[in-house]
Amino acid sequence: MAQGQRKFQAQKPAKSKAAAAAASARNRGPRKGGRVIAPKKARIVQQQQLKKNLEVGIRKKIEHDVVMKASTSLPKKLALLKASTKKKEASSSTKMPA
């Protein structure tokens, strides 16, 4: 039998933060929304890019129309919140050249 007190309590080795984050991401379960699998053929890549650009343009046009209609009907000026410049810079740097 051991004599005296232990100098320190035995502890498990600390896990890295990246490993802990990956483990928690795995344990979260399925996520909402569709999945996009990138195609291999260049023609299909261009078609998807065109489709995405059209969807973005249509959405922006609809948002602009709604804002204009709302601003004309309201007695007070409509103030809109713009996205921060950090997000715009990050999104522009991640775009792939066509």
Swiss-Prot record:
Instruction: Give the family, as the similarity comment puts it.
Output: Belongs to the UPF0390 family.
Query: Where does the record place Low complexity bias?
Result: 16-25, 73-83
Source organism, top-level taxon: Eukaryota
Q: Briefly state the protein's biological role.
A: May have a potential role in hypercalcemia of malignancy.
Compositional bias (Basic residues) at which positions? 28-38
Where exactly are the transmembrane stretches of this chain? none
Pfam families given in the database record: DUF2462 (PF09495)
Task: List the residue ranges of the region (Disordered).
Answer: 1-38, 73-98
The protein, known as? Leydig cell tumor 10 kDa protein homolog
